[in-house]
Amino acid sequence: MRSPARDATRLGRLATWVVAVIVALIAVSRVTGLVVDWMWFASVGYAGVFRTIFLTQALLFLAVFAVSAGALWLSGWLAHRSASQAQAWRPEVLGQPVGEIAARVPWRAAIAGVAVLVGLLMAVGELSSWAIALRYFHQVPFGKTDPIFAKDIGFYFFTLPAYLALRNWLLLLLGCSAVLAGVVYGLRGDIALVRSPRGLSPAAATHGSALLGLFFALQAWSYWLDRFMLLYGDNGVVVGASYTDVHVGLPVLWLQVGLAAAAAAASWANMRWRDYRVPAAAALLVVGSAIVLGTIWPALFQRFYVKPNELQLETPYLQHNIALTREAYGLTQIEVKPFPVEQNLNLAALQANRPTIDNIRLWDLQPLRDTYAQLQEIRTYYKFLATDIDRYQLGAGYQQVMLSARELEPALIPANAQTWVNLHLLFTHGNGVVMSPVTEKSAEGLPSLYLHDIPPLSDGGPVIQEPRLYFGEGGKGYVIVKGSVPEFDYPKGKDNVYTAYRGRDGIGIGGIARRTLFAWHLGDPNILLSGYITQESRILLHRNIRNRVRTIAPFLSLDHDPYVVVSDGRLYWIQDAYTTSRWFPYSQPGTGGGANYIRNAVKVVIDAYNGTVDFYTSDPADPIVQVYQRIFPGMFRPLGAMSQDLQRHIRYPEDLFLIQARIYRAYHMEAAEVFYNREDLWEFPRQLTGMSTGNTPAARMMPYYMILRLPDEPRAEFVLMLPMVPSQRENMIAWLAARSDPPNYGKLVAYTFPKEKLVYGPFQIEARIQQNTEISQQISLWNQMGSRVIRGHLQVVPIENSILYVSPLYLRAESGQLPELKRVIAAYGDRVVMEDTLGAALAALFKESAPAAIPAQGAANARAREALAHYDRAVERLKAGDWSGFGAELDALRPLLEALGAGAADERK
């Protein structure tokens, strides 16, 4: 017969072994993860970044663990040492079964174990504070101060977050110490809450008073820190310290600092008095003041004094919010210029602005991606994940183009072919890009292709010498290169072409130890068991470019749209990265994450073949990136170190521009009274897109790239622009442009229209398009014939001092997936036309500006007929898209018109 004691012993040993095995597995997984991370960071040239982050986390972990465990152990040990020994372990005091448990507890070991366990948990919880610690120790000044406390903005970015993190940890540590001491005293019988006599033993009262004093001292410091948090409050009209905060909240916080400090002193004095009324009175005083003075009194003051005089009292604080919000988002750099809207556009002006006309985008992102997919994906496992917009200097001149990388998606490989070898050794990379001009189309309504097929062929586009993409917007899994299995490169007829990776990326996994390491880390035993892995084999990790950049630089925020670039015969990805913060005083939060400061401080370039990642500082004046340069020396290079060709492709990022435009809707108003009354609030225009079914929902217009010549500028350039309309109105009031070409990269310009002139907004143009009988009848006819009409995005095109509107129209078979560009709608002034091509639409739009023959005799009459003939031929050339012929006819027309004008003047004399 087995003894229950022996069974209990065996069960205890089994439980110990199970726990030990679990802990060992967790430890092994953690260690292997660290080793793999170290190897990967070293392979991409950023071992220093890994070392800095790891050592900071290790030091932070050890410091927090040592202090936390030490403080917890000290609190528990003092409680154990001071507890009333006479009452210890007596079930009649504690009751059953608590008394029996207390009698068996190995107190010293238990207290040490709890201290170590809780200390470990607290240390793990503080690991994420490594960036706060590094920024604190490497901070730089902003050179600007806040208007209330006159502290440098850098204090709020780098010091205040560290103080708040320290406060939160200390409060948690103090709370855990109090709980541990309370449990010890309770189990030892020093706290009687049920049995008589109720109360605390002298030792428990002394210990509790000491801890309560520490709490009040921390609370005093917390109130001191809360003064600075007033700069982020939203109790007034806008974010930031309001009149009530400054004149009521701030004095109250100083009073609460004093009350909490007095309560701390009283609590420590009570260690001698041991009178529960002292800490009770102190707690009541602190809590009561927080409720009455910190909550009720400011609310009453705001309601009955500030609210009736809000504009007068809040004006200085409104000005603080306006000025600092504009500073935080870079809006102070916006140059405001008038746009007179003369609306005197004609064919000659179009010819003078050919770079703009030649680059009006007729292809929307989604229809073009659908067309690329049908024409150029070649095989089911290729995928165009995104369509990008850029500009290139090509044979036809400075052109805006759209392009998409042909990436390999393993999930699209047929299910019966998704073997481990195929997924990780055979299908390793995508191939090439497709590129097309934004304005051109074929006779069938399909895009003209500058780059197409596999391997990529160039028809007027740049030449690609290395088209393979091992790194891209897909690339979710790992691949192994240089194995005994040749890598699939591209299909050729009925056969396939194979290749071998010759790039620099990858971690060697030829040895058995490394194969075991990666098999464990990735949870894939095939890495260890496969016979296709050789001594030269290498594993490529983090092939998704956003994941790759985020792994190296987790402290940067990334733009949603990395874009592919063809440069010097190779493929690169450019990823815009931001430094952000939520600690800019008085600044209005403008992102979903609550950030109220943003700079596009870094441009990241990733080689699509080699996987190399280079960080370039595009805003070296940003204090946050200066701090990171001090933390990670050598990581960031100046933008001038980027190759000249790649520099031609940097562009103003969409996410940043969108955030700035949203803030600028209200914060273009710099006068406090105008801002308070929202007299000139702007909004993004509405427009119609998608299927034309008669009830197409309206959506807000988003920023778009285009090539145009800004007013008073000598040449066309690549800009990101967005029109603006007044709030709850549809007429256009301004347009905002961000310049992308050197040397004006990053400059923002707001062009404002005269308020006395009506300028049609996009939604008003959309309404006029829908009201046009010919256009609506044609769309209805197409829809009835089994086709689906897709309305493209309307583009506002500023030319000279006029506004032109252009919108593409696509047709797609009801059961098909191939959109075709069938019509172009153009509007100018009061006219709306729809034609087969952009040239034909412009010719029809400006047909009324044909020169009228002056009724004269002889040579003048002949010149008039000749001028009209040249004009008619110019219109025909424009319809055909023959811009050189169009220009030649206009050049021939000019002297005839001048002669006619001179003759008419002579007759008037």
Curated annotation (Swiss-Prot):
InterPro entries: UPF0182. It is found in: Cell membrane. Keywords: Cell membrane, Membrane, Transmembrane, Transmembrane helix. It is a multi-pass membrane protein. Pfam families: UPF0182. One of its GO terms (cellular component) is plasma membrane. Its main location: membrane. It comes from the Bacteria. The chain crosses the membrane at residues 16-36, 58-78, 114-134, 169-189, 205-225, 246-266, 281-301. The keyword Membrane applies. Belongs to the UPF0182 family. PANTHER family: UPF0182 PROTEIN SLL1060 (PTHR39344:SF1). This is UPF0182 protein H16_A1615. It comes from Cupriavidus necator (strain ATCC 17699 / DSM 428 / KCTC 22496 / NCIMB 10442 / H16 / Stanier 337).
